[in-house]
Every structure is written in structure tokens, then in C-alpha cells.
């Protein structure tokens, strides 16, 4: 373990820290991913120190050169961590001193690890959100373009997992695409707050050296700077927001996964997953398990747990910095990794999914058109409640006769209502059924086509903002 002389804060204390305490305190394994962004922030801060006359130009050049060397070592995987490195910030500081000597100590002038940690995390999440957004938009695009290609496929729509009305397969796909566009918008909103720069806030009271925070903002390509130093070092709203957005996104992906799991069962047989996203059974050779979709569904629970955990961490801490905040990185970075993987798998599943059109058509049984029978009577002038009752009587009559509703004779229907005429035969067509829903957002072909065009335009805008 590290000696007292090695410790960053060792001058205040006598004796050594319990080794178990050092293990509990260390976050180096999680924080190694912050290496590059910490180097970027350190380079920017060094330039600000030079502008404030704390560093000479020669010292600045040495520090920048040393940081570039560390960046190179990190990218090659040869940056060595030692037992004295409590976190990535101390590891970089230690390595910089090894490379350029005591001048390295000047880099921390006026800068605390409190602001370093939150700055590094914001910089990493800024780029992470861009990656997640790219994958999310690709998934939405895959859903939309598949909907455009398969617009003529009609299937049963369900409520309570019971057959309800005929809909277009494309209407189903677009329902998920639309939900995901809201997630994309929310990611953009979170990014606005992540790109507010806390660097220059010091340990809690601000920076005493007239550091140019606008220079820091410009160097790090952030949108604005934090307003209050105490709030800047302690706020983790952006972590909660990102995980909250991820939670909603995972709810939507879990719903998509569950729908497709159901549709892929032999009882439904509407879709077949690609072998690339399925597994077999060690004992049951006939089975094709939708593991990819089941994992997407289960990963939602993992993300929900991370949200609950970070909320519990934050709810009891006082203002400024507490060691509790060390838990933020593991939580949010795990969520980032989960989303990145899940979105790519979901896109792969959708892009390779086989549609079993014949099975969908077989499932379009005549009782699905019972509502259309009621609408027929409404168009003849009957109030909707009476029309629904009449339709229900027709269903009951068909059941009594042991036939399907479309096999009732005109005389049978007239016994229920004199408004039924020979044109009632047009009701018993699934194409006619879906085509009556022409209002915006409906399942008629014209409406679905309009949805596709609107989503394509929305994707263009969101891609520009990602």
C-alpha cells in the first residue's frame, strides 16, 4: 500500500490507512475511462494558468508535452496504475511528475479534485450521449424504413392481449419509432445541461487566481459555464437526468422486446428472429429462444436499479462535495454501456427480422370486424351506443348459429336492425377496415405514409442536433 509520503493528502495525518479502507475508497478501476477527458481538461486549465501568469510559456509547454505523452501511453494501454493512485486524477498527476518533475505540481494551482471529477464526468458523458443518440437514431430509422417497405401487411391489433382491430404491421412498427423519438429529444435536453462547465469553481468558493473560465469553456467546447461554485461541484442532476432518460428509453425497448417475444412464439408465429439473435436449447432441439429480446427486457431492470441507487446516494448528502458522490460514475457509466449495447442489438433484431405474412393473415379472424359492423350502422344514422349493442347482438347470433359473423345472412342482420342493407358485405374486408382510419395518426395507408414522412423529417433534424 502507499506510504504516507506518497499520499495526496498525507501531510495532515499520522500513521497509515487501513488497507480495506483504501480498497473501499479507490475508484481507479471505474475512473480509468476518464483518462482522456481528464487530460483534455488539464490541458485547458494549464493554458488558463499561463494566461493568468501562474505558468510561464516554457512551463506550459512542458506540462502540455507531458500530458500528451500520458495520453499516448493511455491509448497504447501502457499507462501504469500504482497502489498509491486513488483515482485517475491522482494517477495522471503522479505520472506527470515522473515525466517532467516538480513543475507538474503547478498544474493543480487553484484547482481541486472536486471540480476535476465533475468536469471529467461531464466531458465523458457529452461524447457518450452523442454515441447513444447515433445508435438510437439508427434504430428509429430501421423501424421507419421497414414500415415503409412492409406497409401493405395487415395484422391483428391487440388490447389486453386479446384481438381488437385489424391494423397495418407498419402502424405497429411506427408506434415504437414514435416513442423512441421522444427519448431522442430527451437526450438532447440532458446534453444541454451536461455541457455547462464547472471547471474553475475550485474546492467550493471559486477560483482565486482570476482564471478565465470563458477560455476554459471554449477550449473544452462546452456551451456555458456554471453560475455558482458551490452548486457546480456538488450537483449531479445531470447524472440523475441521464439515467432517468435511459430508464424511459429502456421501458420503450422492453415493450418492443416483449411484443416481439410474443409475436415470435409458435402460438402467434408472426415473426421469426434471425439466428444471429437467437439461441437453441441443450435438451430441446426444436426450440429457438429469443435471447436477444429477453436480455433487452432484463437490462431494463438493471438500469432502473441504477436510478434508484443514485437517488438514494444523493438524497442525504449536504451541500458541496462528499465522498458519497464517488458512486455517480459507476452508476452512470454502467447505464451508458448498457444503452450502447442494447440499442445496437435492438437494431440488429429489427433489421434481420423475418415477417410471416401468412400467419398474420390467418389471425385476421372475422370477429375483428365487429366494430366495423357498428360503424356501418353509425354511418346509416344510428347512435353509437345503439350501434354497439346491435353489433354485439350480431356476434351473439353468429355464436348461437355456430358460424362466423361474416357468414350471417342479410336476413339475419335485418332481424337485428332494418338499417342493414346489401352493401354490408363491404364491411367484411380487412383492407376496407384499416382504410377507414384516415385521420392523422391512423392506420389507413395514407395516414401511415404521412407518419413515415414526418418521422423521416424528424430524424434529419435530430441527426443534425445529435
Curated annotation (Swiss-Prot):
PANTHER family to which the protein is assigned, alphabetical: ARGININOSUCCINATE LYASE
Tissue specificity statement from the Swiss-Prot or TrEMBL entry: Eye lens.
Function: Delta crystallin, the principal crystallin in embryonic lens, is found only in birds and reptiles.
Record-linked SUPFAM superfamilies: L-aspartase-like
GO (cellular component) term, any one: cytosol
Lineage, top ranks: Eukaryota, Metazoa, Chordata, Craniata, Vertebrata
Keyword Nucleotide-binding recorded: no
This protein's UniProt keywords: Eye lens protein
The organism's place on the tree of life at top rank: Eukaryota
GO annotation (BP), single: arginine biosynthetic process via ornithine
Name of this protein: Delta-1 crystallin
InterPro entries: Arg_succ_lyase_C, Argininosuccinate_lyase, Fumarase/histidase_N, Fumarate_lyase_fam, Fumarate_lyase_N, L-Aspartase-like
Family: Belongs to the lyase 1 family. Argininosuccinate lyase subfamily.
Subunit: Homotetramer.
Gene Ontology molecular function terms on file: structural constituent of eye lens
Alphabetized Pfam families for the sequence: ASL_C2 (PF14698), Lyase_1 (PF00206)
Keyword check for Glycoprotein: no
Amino acid at each position: 500500500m502507499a506510504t504516507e509520503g506518497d499520499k495526496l493528502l498525507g501531510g495532515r495525518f499520522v500513521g497509515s490507512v487501513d488497507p480495506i479502507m483504501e480498497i473501499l475508497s479507490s475508484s481507479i478501476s471505474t475512473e480509468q475511462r476518464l483518462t482522456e477527458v481528464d487530460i483534455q481538461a488539464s490541458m485547458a486549465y494549464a493554458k488558463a494558468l499561463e494566461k493568468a501568469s501562474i505558468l510561464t510559456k516554457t512551463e506550459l509547454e512542458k506540462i502540455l508535452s507531458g500530458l500528451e505523452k500520458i495520453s499516448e501511453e493511455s491509448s497504447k494501454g501502457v499507462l501504469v496504475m500504482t497502489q498509491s493512485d486513488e483515482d485517475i486524477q491522482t494517477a495522471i498527476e503522479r505520472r506527470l511528475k515522473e515525466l517532467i518533475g516538480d513543475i507538474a505540481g503547478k498544474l493543480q494551482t487553484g484547482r481541486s479534485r472536486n471540480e476535476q471529477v465533475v468536469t471529467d464526468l461531464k466531458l465523458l458523458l457529452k461524447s457518450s450521449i452523442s454515441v447513444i443518440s447515433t445508435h438510437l437514431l439508427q434504430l428509429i430509422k430501421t423501424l421507419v424504413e421497414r414500415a415503409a417497405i412492409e406497409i401493405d401487411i395487415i395484422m391483428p391489433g391487440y388490447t389486453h392481449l386479446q384481438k381488437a382491430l385489424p391494423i397495418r404491421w407498419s402502424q405497429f412498427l411506427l408506434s415504437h419509432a414514435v416513442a423512441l423519438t421522444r427519448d431522442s429529444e430527451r437526450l438532447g435536453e440532458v446534453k444541454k445541461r451536461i455541457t455547462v462547465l464547472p471547471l474553475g469553481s475550485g474546492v467550493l468558493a471559486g477560483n482565486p487566481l482570476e482564471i478565465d473560465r470563458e477560455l476554459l469553456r471554449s477550449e473544452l467546447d462546452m456551451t456555458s459555464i456554471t453560475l455558482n461554485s458551490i452548486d457546480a461541484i456538488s450537483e449531479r442532476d445531470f447524472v440523475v437526468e441521464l439515467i432517468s432518460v435511459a430508464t424511459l428509453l429502456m421501458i420503450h425497448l422492453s415493450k418492443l422486446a416483449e411484443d416481439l417475444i410474443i409475436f415470435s412464439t409458435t402460438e402467434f408465429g408472426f415473426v421469426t428472429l434471425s439466428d444471429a439473435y437467437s439461441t437453441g436449447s441443450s435438451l430441446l432441439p426444436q426450440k429457438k429462444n429469443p435471447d436477444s429480446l429477453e436480455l433487452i427486457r432484463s437490462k431494463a431492470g438493471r438500469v432502473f436499479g441504477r436510478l434508484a441507487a443514485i437517488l438514494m446516494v444523493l438524497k442525504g448528502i449536504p451541500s458541496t462535495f462528499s465522498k458519497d458522490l464517488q458512486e455517480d460514475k459507476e452508476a452512470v457509466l454502467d447505464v451508458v454501456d448498457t444503452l450502447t449495447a442494447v440499442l445496437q442489438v435492438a437494431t440488429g433484431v429489427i433489421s434481420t427480422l423475418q415477417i410471416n405474412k401468412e400467419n398474420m393473415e390467418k389471425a385476421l379472424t372475422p370477429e375483428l370486424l365487429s366494430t366495423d359492423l357498428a360503424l356501418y350502422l353509425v354511418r346509416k344514422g344510428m347512435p353509437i351506443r345503439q350501434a354497439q349493442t346491435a353489433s354485439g347482438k350480431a356476434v351473439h347470433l353468429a355464436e348461437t348459429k355456430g358460424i362466423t359473423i361474416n357468414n350471417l345472412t342479410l336476413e339475419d342482420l335485418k332481424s337485428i336492425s332494418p338499417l342493414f342493407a346489401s352493401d354490408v358485405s363491404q364491411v367484411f374486408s380487412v383492407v376496407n377496415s384499416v382504410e377507414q382510419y384516415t385521420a392523422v395518426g391512423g392506420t389507413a395507408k395514407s395516414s401511415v405514409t404521412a407518419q413515415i414522412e414526418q418521422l423521416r423529417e424528424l430524424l434529419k433534424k435530430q441527426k443534425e442536433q445529435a
